[in-house]
Amino acid sequence: MSLAQLTQQPVQTVQASSTVAEAARLMCMHSVGALVITDATEVTPLGIITDRDLVWMIAEGLDPHTATVDQFVRSRLHSVCVTESLSDVTKAMREHGVRRLPIVDPEGRLLGIVALDDILLLLGKELADVAAAITGELKQEHRLGAARAETGK
């Protein structure tokens, strides 16, 4: 499976100038736990704001109606290019300690987002497919062995 196929699309975004309250409304409206923060063009990813960021902000006493999401923009956004492998994505998540990464094209334009949960679901399905194939082969071998035993060969 390619990274493009695994990527959640359309990706939910919020402009950097939006308030945290608006980001929370968007998360609720789209049933997502994170939004990619973009510039005014909504093409260039600048950062990510998560539901955990919202909890932290409230715990710190910031006003969600005046605080803007650009406060969550780090100096360097970690993203991966759509041409990279799934292995590269999991390595980047591990190295940067993140659970979600924006997926960009070679020019840096936002294409989607991939979450660790998506990867785990894919790998679980792949393992189940392998287990089913092995089980099928073992059943076939057992049937052949039983048939040989009946015929005495």
Predicted regions located by residue number:
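Short, flexible active-site loop motifs that bind/organize anionic cofactors or intermediates
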Residues: 9-13, 44-45, 79, 109
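The conserved cystathionine-beta-synthase
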Residues: 13-31, 38-39, 80-97, 104-105, ...
